[in-house]
């Protein structure tokens, strides 16, 4: 179900990792049903779409002129705003006035838009953002994509789309998220990195422009219980308390993440494997 709403609050939050800031939500919810999705904890069903797009863009414009950010930094040359923190914008684009949003960032002297996606939306190729929209294609081993991200674009389709979006004027990054630790995880990521490397050569990507962000899994107790109730597959690798520790989210939720004593080693293993196979894919940040 998709409902139209009028956004009444326009809080812009600092990010500092993927982007400099998180924009007020153009949409809230997701029409996918990924097993690990934090959005499903807050909105289990449907999508709410803000109708007052120009009010949100006006707020971003007012904010960016006074944003205290030293540039350039690891987020980029421009002041970057995540426009899709609470949805998959590429999947939901047809419900938004997306061209108006993209034109705002394309034409703005300071601001740049960014979003992560698991959906290849070829309609977006009709627009040339002139490097002012960054698409972060989410990637994980295809074996687990099928189970944990049902009905999303395949990993192969996401990789094959990268040169098309680069040529159309988008900036494209890779979003390794969530990284899930289990018995064969490094073997599976080696295969994924090999495929990425072959694709980059076959499709002649501009390798130096395709950077990466890496986010290890955080899971949630309520989502875990809902997954069990709904009999979703894959929960056995998401919920592993023997290697995880509790964490209270900023909103008071009961989360679990990999134990800090182990996570440093996981990060080291991932980074060494990644850099051995695709060293051209600069990791912007990893946590």
Describe each region flagged by the PLM.
Residues 87-91, 120-123, 133-152, 178-183, ...:
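Conserved radical SAM core fold
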Residues 78-82, 112-114, 132-136, 171-175, ...:
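Structural preference for beta-strand elements that scaffold enzyme active sites
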Residues 152-165:
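Glycine-rich S-adenosyl-L-methionine
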Residues 197-287:
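Auxiliary Fe-S-binding modules of radical SAM enzymes
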Residues 3-22, 35-138, 164:
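Conserved Radical SAM active-site core
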Residues 56, 98, 158, 189, ...:
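Aromatic/hydrophobic pocket-lining residues that form the small-molecule binding cavity
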Residues 24-34:
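Cysteine-centered iron-sulfur cluster-binding motifs in ferredoxin-type domains/subunits
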Residues 184-200:
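Catalytic cores of alpha/beta
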